[in-house]
Amino acid sequence: LRLELRRTDPASINSLHRKAAAWYAEHAHPVEAIRHAQAAEDWRHASRMLTDSYVSLFLDGRRATVRGLLADFPPEAATTDPELAIALAGAGLFARGPEEVTSYIDLAERQAGMVPDERRPLFKLRVAYTKLWQAGRRGDLSEAREAMRAVEEAVAAQPADRLPQLAEHQVAALTTVGVVELWTGEVADAVRHLEEARELARRIERPYQEIGALAHLGVAARMNGETFANGLRLLEQAVALAEAHGWADDPIEGAPALAFLGSELVCLGRFEEAELHLVRAERALAREGTHLTELVVRYGWGMLRFGQGRLEDALAAFRQTERIRPLLSEDVIIDPRGRIVQVWARMGETAPARATLDELSPQERDSRFGRTVVAQILLAEDSPEQVVEVLAPVIEGASEVSWQVDPRMESIEALLYDAAARDELGEARAAEASLERVLELAESEGIILPFAFAPVQGLLKRHPRHGTAHAGLLSQILDVLAGSSPASRGEAAPLLDELSEAELRVVRYLPSNLKAPEIAAELFVSPNTVRTHLRHIYSKLDAHSRREAVDRARELGLLAPGRVR
């Protein structure tokens, strides 16, 4: 029909495209409307529709669609259209270099006078949002807070009838500033902003945005000293939500959730599960993403390989983290240098270990984690007396400066090196006392990773089973250090009645603590529908409880493996 139209009435084609664009715009189909306007070469109309919808499309995970639409504009279009220029800047944050993004922002601001008066408040808001996202990409706290103030001022200047339409923009702003605050150590402010973002995202039914807030709240829980179980619950909810909507492999929201969950599982010694999540996060980031997420993924790989005793691989991963670090603000608290020192020391290479240690400031070396790093070098240099001396302020609580994401890890590592040093000094009772104390600290959370960092395997094997209150954890640690895998329950029998797509979506939420009405809210269905699906799921999986259903689903590969119980 199109070919026939071109042959018989080519003059009407653009008119028909304009009519189609108007119809799609009227019926809230912006992408189709923009494409028809572009086909009609009605660039002004296409630009207006795109600049009015690109943020919403971003927040639906449709960045590739936006970039495709932008690519269809003439190359020179942005030079006379500041609104299009700011859209190009926003689209480029995850795919272009920072210089190109900045040049588009500068171009938009220089041409701000060309924006019609009635559109200027919204234009100023989009400029402020783009600057906030740019600061978030770098992890720059001062720039992010300054941009957030500009966003708040621009929102206040909007007409009252437009404010409800800006809720999704507010979620993005709150999440962005919360993420920057989190990774620069301003955890209390981060939690406040991320909680606001999460609640607002749920209220306006924006699950894509909820994933990011949930995942970062999971990290914040650990930084706040909350239980690992609480942080793990939030991270599992974030991944379940991403899985349910097909966004688990999304580089902007899915990849961070997978990376954070993988890193959490590394700390618990669940290395095989952790690797699955880190692999998926890495694959997603191969397409696009942020340097901050890439930093977390590479650091997670370093911790995993260090825990597995693959020291060369750990060193390579931490060095990759070190190469990413200059692309981010100095405020970002993830710093691989301490771990690089530890890996070198564990390899017996004390010269490069000390060379890296010399890069740390006196304050960093005197921090709780810094003293632990120094202790590992001293232990490798056969100076156990100095190890005990260096660690005393950490163990006694006199050293309060924290240089790690989780202070509990600092305490556990310090006690482990103290135990190793006292063992070398022949102070058997003191070594056992330190080890018993560290087992008590670790057992409440199931923390295993630090036991793989310190040279304590022999000490753990000799630790008397009859004299410890933590025999179960001790056995589990030794299993992990020996490289054992979780015991398999054998080949899972296939399902006689396959789960439907709708039932599979519900299954992905079962590992979380969400109740049926909450799952229904996430999936935008009724609670009764979820309860019906649950009955069918239990029947098909031959399960009598939610826990049995989760275990059976994991056996069948419908869910990622869970923690060995």
Per-range role (PLM):
Residues 479, 486-544, 548-565:
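Helix-turn-helix DNA-binding segment
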Residues 3-91, 95, 100, 104, ...:
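Extended alpha-helical scaffolding segments used for macromolecular assembly and cargo binding
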Residues 34, 54-55, 70-75, 105-117, ...:
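Amphipathic alpha-helical segments of tetratricopeptide repeats
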Residues 12, 32, 38, 45, ...:
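Structural signature of alpha-solenoid helical repeat junctions
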Residues 26-28, 141, 187, 264, ...:
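N-terminal regulatory/sensing modules of transcriptional regulators
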Residues 10, 14, 30, 43, ...:
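TPR-repeat structural position
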Residues 47-56, 83-98, 123-141, 167-186, ...:
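Tandem amphipathic alpha-helical repeat scaffolds
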